[in-house]
Swiss-Prot record:
The record marks 16, 23 as: Transition state stabilizer. The record marks 154, 212 as: Positions MEP for the nucleophilic attack. GO terms for biological process: isopentenyl diphosphate biosynthetic process, methylerythritol 4-phosphate pathway. Its EC number is 2.7.7.60. Catalyzes the formation of 4-diphosphocytidyl-2-C-methyl-D-erythritol from CTP and 2-C-methyl-D-erythritol 4-phosphate (MEP). Gene3D superfamilies: Spore Coat Polysaccharide Biosynthesis Protein SpsA, Chain A. The keyword Secreted does not apply. Transmembrane segments: none annotated. Belongs to the IspD/TarI cytidylyltransferase family. IspD subfamily. This is 2-C-methyl-D-erythritol 4-phosphate cytidylyltransferase. One of its GO terms (molecular function) is 2-C-methyl-D-erythritol 4-phosphate cytidylyltransferase activity. InterPro entries: IspD, IspD/TarI, IspD/TarI_cytidylyltransf_bact, ISPD_synthase_CS, Nucleotide-diphossugar_trans. It is an enzyme of class 2 (transferase). The lineage of its organism: Bacteria, Bacillati, Bacillota, Clostridia, Lachnospirales.
Length: 233
């Protein structure tokens, strides 16, 4: 059986939440936000989980989240970096023998186990795939001065989520070439793989409920979704 490792990122500062508590540790229906994504991966076909956390949070996550909720697939809890991609790199450096890697934002608590399993099935066939949903809005491209430059075809515009999945060797190669991407605004793992310009990345249909907790309003939305969909709990 092929080994699939999930890297769950929980090192974000969450400055837009206007709270002293990191967003991934805020309570959502009496449980930490991070609990929900870890539960989804624990129940999935993933073999093991690496959790990447902020400075001085390793002990807290182990004692207050992983042990109490019995997340047995978590093999490592490591400290993150100053940027998202550096946190992923720290997680990658703990992997010894995986065939595939899924990277997920811990601030996306409403990821479904079925979606994770679909991504695993797709990446085993296609080597690189990311979860996304079709844009509901018209998207405009603007200049730095705020002037509208163009309007892409909405049928080709997707809002990208996580998890993002890759054959381990591909993601490792991409991160080994990080030095050549200096100056690039790297916002997800697909961008780093895109820079290799050798591997097609396929879309996997996601769920509009797979929101990222970024602002206080997002917690309200997530709670409303949980009330309607008990399978997340």
């Amino acid at each position: 059986m092929e080994k699939v490792t999930a890297i769950v990122l929980a090192a974000g500062q969450g400055k837009r939440m206007k709270s002293s508590v990191s967003k991934q540790y805020m309570l959502l229906k009496d449980k930490p936000v991070l609990y929900y994504s870890l539960k989804a991966f624990e129940n999935s076909l993933v073999t093991d989980i690496i959790v990447v956390v902020g400075n001085d949070e390793i002990s807290y996550v182990k004692e207050e989240i992983i042990k109490p909720y019995g997340f047995r697939k978590v093999t490592h809890v490591v400290e993150g970096g100053s940027e998202r991609y550096l946190s992923v790199l720290n997680g990658l450096n703990k992997i010894k023998d995986s065939d595939y890697v899924l990277v997920h934002d811990g601030a996306r608590p409403l990821i479904k186990t079925n979606t994770i399993n679909t991504v695993i099935s797709e990446v085993e066939e296609k080597k690189a795939c990311i979860v996304g949903v079709a844009s509901k809005d018209t998207v405009k491209i603007s200049t730095h001065d705020g002037i509208i430059d163009s309007t892409p075809d909405r049928n080709q515009v997707y809002t990208i989520q996580t998890p993002q999945a890759f054959e381990y060797s591909i993601l490792r190669e991409a991160y080994d070439n990080l030095a050549s991407y200096q100056g690039a605004m790297i916002t997800d793992d697909a961008m780093i793989v895109e820079c290799l310009n050798r591997y097609p990345i396929y879309l996997v249909q996601g769920e509009y409920t797979n929101i990222k907790i970024t602002t206080p309003e997002d917690l309200i939305f997530a709670e409303a979704i949980l009330r309607e969909h008990q399978d997340f709990i």
